[in-house]
């Protein structure tokens, strides 16, 4: 027989750590903010796997500062597993040697710094994930030992109210606490009774009222004033040639001016095309201010959100038939569930990118920026586990020419995955390239694979100002490449197009120009937008939308 | 300007319904069980979308009986959205005209009845989903109006303890309650204070103590006494030729004797191959009793579970370093998160099927059974949104011959998706067929597509008693079909194999027989199993495993 085994090392260790922090508590689970650093130094060990909550919106910024102030002689070589690293402090923690390894999903403004630290050996990269994939690993091989989360309110028993910006908190807390880990929450306000229990108190070990409210980034706010005529044209093409053509009822919209334009075209051009009630009924979507006119015009039946959006809280609360509102009257977002909906329950993903290669692989990575792709790969892929049928999914599968080579005579649907991009971006950088810059990043950052946001075999349509390429209809890779060249304009890739070949593709409906789609270019301008400014959005909302100061110029 | 719009129809309607039920409550949120039918008649309206909790394990059976006892003159044409329909009452509800439409994931023992009702027009099928996909739609276009859920304990404020069998409850409750819906819970025991808050009281509208504990099915218990020598042989092949070959550390095991055999070979053959610490470290897995010897032998680092398994509760609680155990000392399962882990964080899915066609598409559907596939499509597919790299994923992608036709020169990994099946099943039904019976089901049940569990392009390996077919290594569909023929034995598909072609495939390592793998057939027998009976499993667990009576014969 084997020697007696110990099966509760984790809980014993947790108990020891919590005991070491005992005197830092002022009342039940409450720790005064001035004890924040001491608390982390008591419960964190060198080499620990640590989650620091923070996505592209809410940030456990006070706890991040506390972690950054820990003594790196004691606390070092941490393995950070966290959705995003958008704040300077996130990288400072590596700079100080407190953390060493990073598994994440989104770099945001710190993407260049991540690449720099990788080169300098200050940071070791685990992997770049899509959000839901990272959450998945919290229950597999990347469970956090200690998690630093954030909430609006907390009480002395640890109950948390995360409300509008619930975002990643439930999935982090559950994975950590149920593997004997330690969960520490910063809260904007310590209260006697939380407005609503979003996280049960038993899941939380310590609550700290932070000196100021957590940082929130209005990442999904696009000022209609900045939408260009070209974006209007492309939006009209997408609406008629894809949304209408496939009858897309359930979808996600990413960040960006292209989809903002589409949102603002629904009550105008969308109505003109007679599409209300036929498309855009259900969304997995952050509460985009540019959705207000379409919602007010009765287009939308439901929206489930990954996170909140600064300024949109009151508007969402006043539209409980549309958004997911709790019994207390405030919204609850949930990134894990919304990403799940985005993966399995939507018929289309549409968004922008930085570069598309001649095969149709696309990426926002550049040679010197470890950007990460957030939720895009999860929604911008063909969800192969999907089994339910919708008209648009079935239609795209039916026209997918290469399916027989994969499945024999077995039919299957296909999700619409659309990339919208002008052929040239600012500074005249071409969007279509022979080889993605991601290859150079892979070399520079010593990655196993070039970071691709959307792979060619998942991509079904490209929309540029030149036209739409219907890639699923192509026979084989060569034809797909020809279709891409056909909409790539004056880029190197586009210039290699054979006009005769493009003409044939147009005749077969694989490439469609605005004219092929019956769109009058002279109408494609900003006058088509249902709102032309942030002020228009506020008015349309009846004053419920409260834009952040940086968007207010009246 | 438009006329004044109403944006709170849902909450107004909910309030009206709850008011109608007002006098049925005895104390705060408590409704006596004899008022169960009256409660449902008060809060449910004809045509409602209703969730009735019940997966392949725990069942809200009392509430199902209550629903089945409602007056079909009042309550009819319900649209049921529920994970599974394994109980007779689930179909009775349709028989009585109370429900009309069904969206689900798993039929289990009622699969034939579902097909029958479809033919007779008693039931209209929305779609067959994989679990996570159905959950996804709860946040998109299939949000329940009323959900009938179940828990071990509930208190007067609606707080629920769902513990070991938390399973689907959190995702159902959140989707329903936050879209202004009504959540009714049956509990085994009404208590003053629940052991642990799994569902906050505010998410629950009514709690009913059911007359008897909810039904639990020990679906994942396999008696080692019933494992055959052939299953041992195939298990040895899989361990050496796939688990060991690819170094599979993170995985799921489905239901069945093939994977039960593998679990029981880890402490014997697995150790002999020197694989401990190199494979099978992290699982998304129900607490299979046949995992006990491998856990005790130190193979496993973590297991996150979809649900509980009858008899395994004490064992799991005594192994908190392995399972996900809460602060109260009891386990919390979670199907939504475990399926997410199964989709995005595992390197391999392995399981059995009923039929594989000549192209490699497989299904458990037959002409007269609407079976559904539970979690299999979610885990038995290539997760295209995945971006993190592991050795096994990278290796399978590198040997995937057809990748260049899809992606050009862009490399990508590939998940291992393995089907294990003897070439003939009981009654000598061939496992390999020209055309799946699923085609006939599609015709009989008027489905848009034949229900396929795993599509050919996701399948990477087939293991039969003849050998392993390494499908990802094949060049094109024709060669993949030849490899399938090469392991299909004396089935019609297998008999059409060209021996010369199979020989070439063996030389190229695309087909490997036990001899090619260096496995001595004479050793492939039950003596290799680490436990040969349920009694052995109990002993190995130190008496912690308490098997259900039907498995106890000593």
UniProtKB/Swiss-Prot annotation, chains A, B:
Keywords: Cytoplasm, Transferase
GO cellular component, one term: cytoplasm
Presence of keyword Transferase: yes
Entry's pH dependence statement: Optimum pH is 5.5.
Location in or out of the cell: Cytoplasm
Pfam families noted in UniProt: Mal_decarbox_Al
Recorded GO MF terms: transferase activity
Reactions catalysed: acetyl-[ACP] + malonate = malonyl-[ACP] + acetate
Principal localisation: cytoplasm
Family annotation (Gene3D superfamilies): Glutaconate Coenzyme A-transferase (3.40.1080.10)
Keyword Transferase annotated: yes
First-tier enzyme category under EC: transferase
EC nos: 2.3.1.187
Described function: Alpha subunit of the biotin-independent and biotin-dependent malonate decarboxylase multienzyme complex (EC 4.1.1.88 and EC 7.2.4.4, respectively). Acts as an acyl-carrier protein (ACP) transferase component. This first step in malonate decarboxylation involves the exchange of an acetyl thioester residue bound to the activated ACP subunit for a malonyl thioester residue. Has a weak activity with acetyl-CoA as substrate.
NCBIfam families: mdcA
The protein, known as: Acetyl-S-ACP:malonate ACP transferase
Source organism of this protein record: Malonomonas rubra
């Amino acid at each position: 027989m084997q020697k007696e085994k110990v099966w509760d090392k984790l809980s014993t260790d947790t108990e020891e750590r919590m005991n070491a922090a005992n005197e830092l508590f002022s009342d039940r689970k409450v720790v005064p903010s001035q004890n924040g650093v001491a608390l982390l130094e008591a419960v964190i060990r060198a080499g620990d796997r640590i989650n620091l909550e923070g996505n592209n919106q809410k940030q456990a910024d006070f706890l991040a500062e506390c972690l950054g102030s820990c003594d790196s002689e004691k606390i070092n070589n941490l393995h950070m597993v966290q959705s995003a690293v958008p704040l300077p402090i996130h990288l400072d923690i590596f700079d100080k040697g407190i953390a060493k390894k990073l598994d994440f999903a989104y770099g945001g403004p710190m993407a260049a710094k991540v690449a720099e630290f990788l080169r300098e050996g200050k940071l070791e990269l685990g992997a770049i994930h899509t959000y839901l994939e990272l959450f998945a690993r919290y229950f597999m091989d990347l469970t956090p030992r200690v998690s630093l989360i954030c909430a609006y309110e907390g009480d002395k028993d640890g109950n948390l109210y995360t409300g509008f910006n619930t975002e990643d908190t439930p999935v982090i807390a559950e994975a950590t606490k149920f593997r004997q880990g330690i969960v520490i929450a910063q809260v904007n306000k310590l209260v006697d009774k939380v407005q609503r229990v979003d996280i049960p108190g038993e899941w939380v070990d310590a609550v700290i009222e932070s000196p100021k409210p957590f940082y929130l980034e209005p990442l999904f706010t696009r000022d209609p004033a900045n939408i260009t005529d070209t974006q209007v044209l492309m939006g009209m093409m997408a609406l008629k040639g894809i949304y209408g053509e496939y009858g897309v009822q359930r979808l996600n919209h990413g960040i960006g001016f292209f989809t903002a334009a589409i949102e603002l075209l629904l009550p105008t051009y969308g109505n003109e095309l007679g599409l209300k009630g036929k498309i855009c009924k259900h969304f997995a979507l952050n509460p985009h201010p540019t959705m207000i006119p379409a919602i007010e015009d009765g287009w939308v039946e439901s929206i489930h959100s990954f996170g909140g959006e600064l300024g949109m809280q009151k508007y969402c609360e006043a539209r409980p038939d549309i958004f997911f509102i709790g019994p207390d009257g405030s919204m609850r977002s949930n990134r894990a569930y919304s990403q799940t909906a985005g993966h399995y329950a939507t018929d289309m993903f549409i968004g922008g990118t930085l570069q598309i290669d001649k095969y149709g692989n696309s990426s926002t990575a550049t040679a010197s920026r470890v950007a990460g792709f957030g939720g895009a790969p999860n929604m911008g892929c063909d969800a192969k586990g999907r089994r339910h049928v919708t008209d648009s999914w079935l239609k795209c599968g039916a026209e997918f020419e290469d399916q027989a080579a994969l499945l024999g005579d077995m039919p299957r649907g296909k999700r619409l995955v659309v990339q919208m991009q002008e052929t040239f971006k600012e500074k005249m950088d071409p969007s279509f390239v022979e080889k993605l810059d991601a290859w150079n990043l892979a070399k520079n950052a010593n990655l196993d694979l070039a970071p691709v946001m959307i792979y060619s075999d998942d991509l079904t349509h490209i929309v540029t100002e030149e036209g739409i390429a219907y890639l699923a209809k192509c026979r084989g890779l060569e034809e797909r490449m020809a279709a891409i060249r056909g909409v790539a304009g004056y880029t190197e890739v586009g210039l290699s197009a054979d006009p005769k070949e493009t003409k044939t593709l147009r005749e077969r409906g694989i490439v469609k120009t605005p004219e092929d789609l019956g769109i009058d270019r002279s109408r494609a301008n900003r006058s088509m937008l249902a709102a032309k400014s942030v002020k228009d959005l506020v008015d349309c909302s009846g004053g419920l939308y409260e834009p952040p100061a940086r968007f207010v110029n009246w």
